[in-house]
Amino acid sequence: MKEIFLQISNRQDLSQDQVQVVFDRILKNEVSESQIASFLMGLKIKGETSDEITGIVRALKSHATVLPETFTDAMCNCGTGGDQSYSFNISTTACFVLAAGGIRMAKAGNRSISSKSGSADVLEVLGINVAASPEILSKALDEVGLAFIFAQTMHPAMRFIGPARQALGIPTIMNLVGPLANPLDLETQLMGLYRVELQEIVANAIQQLGRKRAVIITGPDNMDEAALYGTNTYTLLEDGHISQHTFTYEDLGMEKVELSDITGGDAKENAEILLSVLRNEASPYLETTVLNIGLGFFANGKAGTIKEGVELARQLIADGSALEKLRKLQEVQV
């Protein structure tokens, strides 16, 4: 590790191979907690690169639990977290509607770190087994078109990194890596990101990982979701090209919703919010979720524009298709 630390201290970027070797050792529990913390902090101070992100993702995937069935058409819509917005579980709610629209959703997630309720916490309240076996996850992806991929189950070696991350208490490269380390080889992706200036770096990493199409979204105030106030910035990966764009709620003909109107609560409260959205109960939560679903359909290519995606989202919620996806997942992922 000494040579690696020297290189980072000289603000020299690491290659994919170098990072992959380091993380392979970390995931085998061959590196001390203090060294892991120093490594993560060093990369943060130096500035993370797409090669470094890709190297860590590949190391994690090589140690991940493998599903018995291969799926090559899946999508994930989880974000980095770390935005301190304390909003409700938007991407978790959205995944049921995206699945109802015909997208196979391999929704990655974890327990709460900075918010009151992580996706795993909410889904447990709803009776979904977040620690389901690989066999059950494959069945859910096949029969429901949706499964919740719990980070702790699919990446058991991540436990060696957790203490160092908790000790640091700040976002690191691991926040960027988490949404990209889905054990499935995703075809498309919608990724929320807490810093606009990292979008191009992450887009390059996503391209290196073989995604056909992706959208990386940062909302106003560096939210890792799109919001109905201020300006949203997204980077689009399409046909090998990377481009950055902005939009506002006014561009989509939607009403303004302040951040204070979509604050979440504990797992039980957020589960009730999720159900209210899928029941099509009018609220700021519904409008914000519909926006992010529309972005998901656009990221996948199911919709030609975000506005078209929003319209599709409204239809799938109104006709009960999205709520039915939840019911089916409750029956299968047990």
Swiss-Prot record:
Enzyme class, broadest EC rank: transferase
Binding residues for Mg(2+) 2: 224-225
Binding site for anthranilate 1: 79, 110
Reactions mediated catalytically: N-(5-phospho-beta-D-ribosyl)anthranilate + diphosphate = 5-phospho-alpha-D-ribose 1-diphosphate + anthranilate
Family matches, as Gene3D superfamilies: Nucleoside phosphorylase/phosphoribosyltransferase catalytic domain, Transferase, Pyrimidine Nucleoside Phosphorylase, Chain C
Entry binding sites for Mg(2+) 1: 91, 225
A GO cellular component annotation in the UniProt record: cytosol
The protein's Enzyme Commission number: 2.4.2.18
Residues reported in the UniProt entry to bind anthranilate 2: 165
One of the protein's GO biological processes: L-tryptophan biosynthetic process
Co-factor requirement: Mg(2+)
Keyword Coiled coil: no
Keywords linked to the UniProt accession: Amino-acid biosynthesis, Aromatic amino acid biosynthesis, Glycosyltransferase, Magnesium, Metal-binding, Transferase, Tryptophan biosynthesis
InterPro entries membership: Anthranilate_Pribosyl_Tfrase, Glycosyl_Trfase_fam3, Glycosyl_Trfase_fam3_N_dom, Glycosyl_Trfase_fam3_N_dom_sf, Nuc_phospho_transferase
Binding residues for 5-phospho-alpha-D-ribose 1-diphosphate: 79, 82-83, 87, 89-92, 107-115, 119
Cofactor details (free text): Binds 2 magnesium ions per monomer.
Keyword Metal-binding: yes
Pathway: Amino-acid biosynthesis; L-tryptophan biosynthesis; L-tryptophan from chorismate: step 2/5
Similarity comment text for this entry: Belongs to the anthranilate phosphoribosyltransferase family.
NCBIfam families xref list: trpD
Function: Catalyzes the transfer of the phosphoribosyl group of 5-phosphorylribose-1-pyrophosphate (PRPP) to anthranilate to yield N-(5'-phosphoribosyl)-anthranilate (PRA).
Subunit (UniProt): Homodimer.
Protein name: Anthranilate phosphoribosyltransferase
Organism annotation: Streptococcus thermophilus (strain ATCC BAA-250 / LMG 18311)
Upper taxonomic lineage: Bacteria, Bacillati, Bacillota, Bacilli, Lactobacillales
Primary gene name: trpD
